[in-house]
């Protein structure tokens, strides 16, 4: 007998599908109260997006519900974003007395929503944030970085003994273009410092004193 009932139920279900009356998704959850609440409240699952419980409408949404439909019929070529802007502007122009009936209707809808979904909590969807790209600095950024390199005598004390060393340092400053990074600029400045120190040791006064000392030594 039990098998016969199952066959009858199966035949009725097949007949229902044959006539084009598919079963609703909510009918599959009527045997379990927990599953029924899960279906209504938009729990985990593939159908959670379609069964998501919406927030109760506020006063503006109550007012704009009919106004949006009316404006869309009067202006079929107008985009939805433009309609929203126009409705927002019109809502601001209304007086408090004109808005009050819609506030009352919104409070009534909120009370009904609390009775129907006592465990409802508003969970806003997180907006997708664009990932930060880790790329090299462009040419403009490197040029700004080069501008921050300041030649200060406290860090690089140059000593000019003649016009040749001054001209060499002038050429070095021309080489510090904005296309070079800061590390390259520092290394070039250090090389110039060492070359300036070497030129200081080999200055004309030092060479003349050395030559006079050698001449007096060989004359003896």
Swiss-Prot record:
Annotated DNA-binding residue span(s): 53-121
Keyword match RNA-binding: no
Region entry Disordered, spans: 25-52
GO CC aspect terms: cytoplasm; nuclear speck; nucleus
Keyword Transcription belongs to the record: yes
GO BP terms in the entry: cell differentiation; male sex determination; positive regulation of gene expression; positive regulation of transcription by RNA polymerase II; sex differentiation
Function comment: Transcriptional regulator that controls a genetic switch in male development. It is necessary and sufficient for initiating male sex determination by directing the development of supporting cell precursors (pre-Sertoli cells) as Sertoli rather than granulosa cells. Involved in different aspects of gene regulation including promoter activation or repression. Binds to the DNA consensus sequence 5'-[AT]AACAA[AT]-3'. SRY HMG box recognizes DNA by partial intercalation in the minor groove and promotes DNA bending. Also involved in pre-mRNA splicing.
Name of the protein: Sex-determining region Y protein
The organism of origin for this protein: Canis lupus familiaris
Gene name linked to the record: SRY
């Amino acid at each position: 007998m039990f098998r016969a009932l199952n066959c009858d139920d199966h035949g009725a279900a097949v007949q229902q599908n044959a006539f084009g009356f598919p079963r609703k998704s909510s009918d599959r959850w009527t045997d379990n109260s927990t599953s029924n609440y899960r279906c209504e409240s938009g729990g985990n699952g593939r159908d959670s997006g379609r069964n998501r419980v919406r927030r109760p409408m506020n006063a503006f949404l109550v007012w704009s519900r009919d106004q949006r439909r009316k404006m869309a019929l009067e202006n079929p070529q107008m985009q939805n974003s433009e309609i929203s802007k126009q409705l927002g502007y019109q809502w601001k122009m209304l007086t408090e007395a004109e808005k009050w009936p819609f506030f009352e209707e919104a409070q009534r809808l909120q009370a009904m929503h609390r009775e129907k979904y006592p465990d409802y909590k508003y969970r806003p969807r997180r907006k997708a944030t664009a990932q930060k790209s880790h790329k090299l600095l462009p040419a403009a950024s490197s040029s700004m970085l080069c501008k921050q390199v300041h030649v200060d005598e406290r860090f690089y004390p140059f000593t000019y003994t003649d016009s040749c060393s001054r001209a060499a340092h002038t050429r070095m400053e021309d080489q510090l273009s904005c296309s070079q990074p800061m590390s390259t600029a520092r290394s070039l400045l250090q090389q110039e410092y060492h070359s300036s120190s070497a030129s200081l040791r080999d200055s004309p006064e030092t060479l003349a004193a050395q030559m006079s000392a050698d001449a007096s030594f060989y004359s003896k």
